[in-house]
């Protein structure tokens, strides 16, 4: 019985010693992150199809899709294209030395020219954030006018490349 009692006292002493010797301390540390202001842009092709001289203007659309950080104000501009001597009011598709005029607008009536000068002829919007369903889709309204200059061009395929710039 003494052996059992002695063993029990030793066990209690060890537990008591373990409890008395266990101490803790705590601290905190800050956790931070900065969400960067950011925008991503993509655009679909603008294909006018076939322009038949003397049959009226040809109208088509394209879409510029922009994702920007939530609450970020941005401007979307379209440059004059890659053809020398083109302007944002009269862009030019080329086929060799021949140039087919066209224009890009920001409204369905095709009266508001879409250019590349912030505060003058760009389109301003506010970002919805990133993720599914948050894209800001902007329609580009294109027109090949049935103008006198366009009516004297040879048949063929005419092309240009327009650069989209998002300023934020």
Where do the language-model regions lie?
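Bacterial N-terminal signal peptides that target proteins for export
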Residues: 1-8
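Polar, enzyme-active/binding microenvironments
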Residues: 12
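N-terminal signal peptide c-region/cleavage motif recognized by signal peptidases
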Residues: 17-19
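N-terminal small/polar-rich segments of proteins
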Residues: 22-97, 125-168
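Predominantly extracellular/luminal cell-surface or secreted proteins
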Residues: 77-81, 103-107, 115
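Contiguous segments within soluble domain cores/interaction surfaces
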Residues: 98-101, 111
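Extracellular beta-sheet repeat scaffolds used for adhesion and glycan interaction
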Residues: 109-135
